[in-house]
Amino acid sequence: MKRLVFPPLAWLVLFLVVPTAIVAVQAFSLDGLKQFNGDTLRLLVKSTWISLQVTVLCLVIGYPVAAFIAGCSPRWRRVLLLLVVVPLWTNVIVRTYSQIFLLRPLGWYLAMPGVIAGLVHGYLPFMILPLYVSLEKVPRRLLEAAQDLGASPARAFWSVTVPLTLPGIAAGCILVFIPVLGSFAVPELLGGREAVMFGSQVNYWFMTGRNAAAGSALTLILVALTLALTGLYYRLRKTEGLV
């Protein structure tokens, strides 16, 4: 049994623990510590605000889509889920360049609305899939019982469906928020200099600025945020009894 555990454990240590340790060591060097300043904080706040907007839009769009898929027959569910996943098979650069042709006539190209639209399009599947899993598990008899007791469809939705799908909502929000916060390809291609985000700055220090310590410091901030949000999610699951 121990021999079966060793390969995946070695993989995690080699490709996760060791790189993270190297990043942490470089982050606390002199060049790395210089990045913990007001400019970095302002960029983090700006990127967090953009990530929140994208996450909320993905939730607003993704919830009814996931509910519609969950209400379809098994055959149509497979077809619709395939359509949700298909965009992920396309390279992000190719997909983003194709979006330019749609955004330019609207005047959204090289503007923040275009960046948000591109990010929503790219990360919407990561919201739909966990929501679909949660909605599929909601017992229909509970909704019928709520309506039999006099609840309107809207009241039954907010009182029954939403609480039962909180795990999917939380998982979808984390799966969207964290990657958007660290994204750089879509903001750079669709927004230019007006849409520099936290991930763009990390990419700049590693690839253009050739300052691994500065890039490591910013990366460490992203890692810390990821761990904090993941820890908060599991804590909520425990305290609220989410399953």
Model feature map: region roles:
Residues 236-243:
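Short cytosolic juxtamembrane segments of multi-pass membrane proteins
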Residues 149-150, 163:
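Glycine/proline-centered hinge or cleavage motifs at structural transition points of membrane proteins
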Residues 33-34, 134-135, 159, 204-205:
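Short alpha-helical segment immediately N-terminal to, or the first helix within
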Residues 138-142:
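Short glycine/proline-centered loop/turn elements that form peptide/ligand docking sites
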Residues 145-146:
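Append "Primarily bacterial transcriptional regulators
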Residues 184-212:
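Glycine-rich helix-loop "coupling/hinge" segments at transmembrane-helix boundaries
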